[in-house]
């Protein structure tokens, strides 16, 4: 997997290969600071969004400001690529031309996650997401399908 602008470092390549070659429900990373975890996660989100048509994906950031930043970065990176059908910053949803919908939510307000049925969830900085937010809001969206 290599898209314009993203060339994984060897350790990232190992993580990507591990994720793509397994069918596990959960995959977690424990890594040092400032080594590209969020960038790797963004690229995995886009990989699944592009390669799993009509999927529903969820990006969860522990804090609202982090989620808005990631949403803006992704829109800036892909808006002219031809893969975006609609990017709604106010609703925090990107819809791709293949029917995939990507929701961006914050664990600060887990009630905004409830009610969604998600195929794949991507949780950035998961150590800052409360057990309550994960167990009562995020996990049920994955098991609803």
What are these language model-derived features?
Residues 1-145:
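Phosphate/NTP-binding elements of NTP-utilizing enzymes
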């Amino acid at each position: 997997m290599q898209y314009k602008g993203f060339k994984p470092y060897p350790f990232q390549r190992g993580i990507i290969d591990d994720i793509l070659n397994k069918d596990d429900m959960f995959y977690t990373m424990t890594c040092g600071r400032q080594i590209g975890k969020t960038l790797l996660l963004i690229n995995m989100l886009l990989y699944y969004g592009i390669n799993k048509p009509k999927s529903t994906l969820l990006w969860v950031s522990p804090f609202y400001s982090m989620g808005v930043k990631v949403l803006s970065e992704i829109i800036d990176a892909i808006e002219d690529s031809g893969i975006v059908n609609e990017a709604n910053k106010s609703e925090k949803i990107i819809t791709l031309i293949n029917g995939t919908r990507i929701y961006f939510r914050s664990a600060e307000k887990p009630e905004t996650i409830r009610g969604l049925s998600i195929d794949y969830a991507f949780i950035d900085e998961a150590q800052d997401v409360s057990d309550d937010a994960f167990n009562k809001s995020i996990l049920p969206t994955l098991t609803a399908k």
